[in-house]
Every structure is written in C-alpha cells, then in structure tokens.
C-alpha cells in the first residue's frame, strides 16, 4: 500500500474517516480506536487539536505500522472558526445535585462521562444530550476555541497530515481570520477539510469560502455535516447528511464531498439507492466520516483496556473482535465502490 492511498481513496470515492471527536480526549481509547480502524481500512483518523491527543493517535497508528508493515492513514486535527457544537463540553457543579436525583444525564451520556463527581472532561465530546434532560437544569455547555496559530507548528512536527475547519453560515469573517492565520502552514498539509452543518444558505456560503480558498490548497474536502454528533442514535439520522451531499454534488463548489453528521451503517445503502457513489455518476460522493457510529459499538471492548492502561494489540482476541466490528462499518463503502476491502489481518487469525 502506497503512502498516497488516502488521496487515492478520495479520488476513487471510497474514503473512510474515523472521527474521534474535536473535544474528545480519552487518550487510551483514542490510541486503540486509531489502531482498530486503521486495521479495518480507514483512510484518515480525525482527532482533537491537542498534542497529547495527537501523540495517542499516532501511537495507535505506529502500532498498526508495526503489525502490518503498511503506511498509516492520514491523521487530521479539527479546528473551529468560532462557536461550534463540536467544541464544547458539558459542566455542572455536583454539589448542587440532589441525592435523590434519578440522574437521567448518566443514562443518556454515550461515553459514560458523567459520574457523581461531575463531568469527566476527557470523555465528553459535546453531544449535548445531557443538557435538556437534567430535571433542575444544572448542566451547561462550556464552549472553547482552538488556538490554531499556537498549536499547529507543534502538531505538524508531531506528524499530522491534514486539518479540518468547522464553520457555519454567517462565519465569513471568522473563517477569513482563521484562514489568514493558517497561511504559513498550508503547504505542509496533504488536505484541508471544511465542515459545515446543513442550512438553507449553506451552499451559497461554501461558494463564498471557495472564493477565499481559491487554488491555494490542492485537495479540499467539503464535509456535509447533516445532523452533528448523532450517528449512534438511529438509522434515520443519516438522511440530513445525504440530502446535503446530494445538493453539494449538483450545486456546490468543486472539491471532494464527504458526508458526516448522522452517518452510520445505513449511509452507504442510501447513497447507493440514490446513485451518489462511484461509478454510478460523474460527480460522486468521495467518502464518509463516522464518529458516534464508529466509537459506540467498540466501547465495551475498549473501555476496560483503557481503565487498565493496556494496549489493544496485547489482547489478540479483543483486537480481533474490535477489528471485525470496525470492518462491518468500513467495508460496505469499500465494497460498493470497488475499493480494497480489508479482511481480518492474518496475524489476528493465528491460533495460539
């Protein structure tokens, strides 16, 4: 496998990106997620723009290289040009919680980030499901913004390959300011992803950004963030991203169109049904990115190892189960477009 395989996957229409979460910083899980999805055939791993997170993801990808002798997927970090749902964490004062509270917040949290002592910040990725469910309204969201100019030099030295900019309609000024900050480092990047949530004016807004970006970046990925952070809720969450991508393919600016925000195991079938995949149409969806739908099915396998600070590859049976689960999500896109479907690596099938 060549070092350019992620770009080839984009161009061919079978790109798969694992989203670890722009605010998610549970380091042992991130390491093992990166290893698992690399083995399953992912082309890119997207993580928070924090050095410790990047190091953890790279440790998982280094384990992949050792185990397979193959080049690793790209590593991408997420930035924001202003307030954004992906860049927030829940917070509450546990001393204000009544002792007899049924604690519905704990039940709805997909990462078990909420305990009797409050929110574990490294586990919270800002999905917001706890915010409306607190009986006393004690939970609030704390937003934050990545200091791109301060962090990017170190992250590039560590070995990131790409960045993703989260933006939204009405952020032209904020995007332009961030874009100017990024100029010195753009030549070092393999790709730039621009993520925007669905909105009636989204395509016109992205055309405005295209004029600003121009030809300064060779590989641009437009991420159609249909229903942010919802892919693990149910099958129907994929529809918004599919509709947005369909509109982008016919009306949007040039570049690779990649779905996110509600993507799940049903996304590929819907894209096939609408003939949006290669080679069914001349301009096709370049790929999909999955967050909750990719992480949640692996939680029961990876969390116990994280608590014990154990590497996944030291437990072959768990690794095989994790990779099998991941292939079930990655494989359909690769198969549908004729990409190289990853089978269970031979070393995982060896019996002791």
Curated annotation (Swiss-Prot):
Gene behind this protein: ldpA
Cofactor(s) needed: [4Fe-4S] cluster
Record key words, sorted: 4Fe-4S, Biological rhythms, Iron, Iron-sulfur, Metal-binding
Positions of [4Fe-4S] cluster 2 binding: 124, 127, 130, 134
The UniProt record lists the keyword Metal-binding: yes
Cofactor-binding details, from the entry: Binds 2 [4Fe-4S] clusters.
Protein name as catalogued: Light dependent period A
The protein's assembly and partners: Interacts with KaiA, CikA and SasA; the complexes do not follow circadian rhythms.
Organism: Synechococcus elongatus (strain ATCC 33912 / PCC 7942 / FACHB-805) (Anacystis nidulans R2)
């Amino acid at each position: 496998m060549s070092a350019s395989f992620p770009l080839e996957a984009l161009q061919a229409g079978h790109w798969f990106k694992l989203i670890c979460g722009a605010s998610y910083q549970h380091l042992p899980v991130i390491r093992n997620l990166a290893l698992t999805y690399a083995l399953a055939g992912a082309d890119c791993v997207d993580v928070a723009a924090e050095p410790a997170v990047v190091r953890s993801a790279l440790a998982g990808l280094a384990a992949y290289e050792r185990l397979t002798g193959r080049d690793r997927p790209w590593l991408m970090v997420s930035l924001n040009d202003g307030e954004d749902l992906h860049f927030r964490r829940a917070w509450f004062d546990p001393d204000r919680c009544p002792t007899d509270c049924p604690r519905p917040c704990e039940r709805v949290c997909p990462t078990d980030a909420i305990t009797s002592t409050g929110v574990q910040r490294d586990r919270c990725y800002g999905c917001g499901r706890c915010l409306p469910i607190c009986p006393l309204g004690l939970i609030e969201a704390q937003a934050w913004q990545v200091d791109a100019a301060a962090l990017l030099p170190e992250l590039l030295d560590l070995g990131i390959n790409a960045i993703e900019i989260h933006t939204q309609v009405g952020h032209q000024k904020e995007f332009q300011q961030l874009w100017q900050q990024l100029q010195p480092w753009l030549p070092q990047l393999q790709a730039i992803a621009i993520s925007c949530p669905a909105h009636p004016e989204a395509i016109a807004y992205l055309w405005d950004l295209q004029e600003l970006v121009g030809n300064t970046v060779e590989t641009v990925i437009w991420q159609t963030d249909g229903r942010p952070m919802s892919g693990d809720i149910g099958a129907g969450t994929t529809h918004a991203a599919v509709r947005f991508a369909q509109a982008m393919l016919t009306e949007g600016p040039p570049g690779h169109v990649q779905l996110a925000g509600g993507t799940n195991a049903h996304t590929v079938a819907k894209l096939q049904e609408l003939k949006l995949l290669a080679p069914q149409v001349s301009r096709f969806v370049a790929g999909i990115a999955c967050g909750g739908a990719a992480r949640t099915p692996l939680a029961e396998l990876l969390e116990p190892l994280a608590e014990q600070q154990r590497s996944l590859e030291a437990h072959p049976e768990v690794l095989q189960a994790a990779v099998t689960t991941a292939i079930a999500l990655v494989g359909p896109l690769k198969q549908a477009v004729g990409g190289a479907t990853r089978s269970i690596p031979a070393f995982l099938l060896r019996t002791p």
